[in-house]
Swiss-Prot record:
GO cellular component: cytoplasm; endoplasmic reticulum; endoplasmic reticulum membrane; Golgi membrane; multi-pass translocon complex
UniProt-recorded name of the protein: Calcium load-activated calcium channel
GO molecular function per UniProt: calcium channel activity; ribosome binding
Intramembrane residue numbers: 121-130
Protein's GO biological process: calcium ion transmembrane transport; endoplasmic reticulum calcium ion homeostasis; ER overload response; multi-pass transmembrane protein insertion into ER membrane
Cytoplasmic side: 33-86, 163-188
Transmembrane segment boundaries: 5-32, 87-106, 141-162
Classification via PANTHER family: CALCIUM LOAD-ACTIVATED CALCIUM CHANNEL, PNAS-RELATED
Lumenal topological domain residue ranges: 1-4, 107-120, 131-140
Stated role: Calcium-selective channel required to prevent calcium stores from overfilling, thereby playing a key role in calcium homeostasis. In response to endoplasmic reticulum (ER) overloading, assembles into a homotetramer, forming a functional calcium-selective channel, regulating the calcium content in endoplasmic reticulum store. Component of the multi-pass translocon (MPT) complex that mediates insertion of multi-pass membrane proteins into the lipid bilayer of membranes.
Localization annotation: Endoplasmic reticulum membrane; Golgi apparatus membrane
Species this protein is from: Danio rerio (Zebrafish)
Amino acid sequence: MSTMFADTILIVFISICTALLAEGITWVLVYRTDKYKRLKAEVEKQSKKLEKKKETITESAGRQQKKKIERQEEKLKNNNRDLSMVRMKSMFAIGFCFTALMGMFNSIFDGRVVAKLPFVPLSYIQGLSHRNLLGEDYTDCSFIFLYILCTMSIRQNIQKMLGLAPSRAATKQAGGFLGPPPQAAKFS
């Protein structure tokens, strides 16, 4: 049990180090560039401006006002797309680093139970949570599962601590995979 605890602590430490490495790479390739700074400031400004306009608009607002809001939403969407494209080059570098590091660490922890889950994962996640482990106890956790969970959560928190995460206003306006969709349809 003590080796399992030591492995878990080591994996959390590895996740912190790889998240810091990823943010360092992103800072070098993206965050310090003038283009990124300009686009980020523009997105922030547009998000706040659009939020204010949406708060003041009424149901009986004129067609002209609704058109202005639609144009601003389109402009914001384009700037968000440009911002994503600027960040894309660092994503390739980070993906390459993470893949290389994950392969190396996966070979070190191959076949070792690194943690015990307090639940049985859903069947479609069991392939990841129980990867390269012997036995049928699906509460056993493999390196890859713990590493991915730790890296995802730690990296987000590091971005917030360093002030590099997108603002709530920009995230809210952009929609995104898990966020609410943009409310452009409300004015149609």
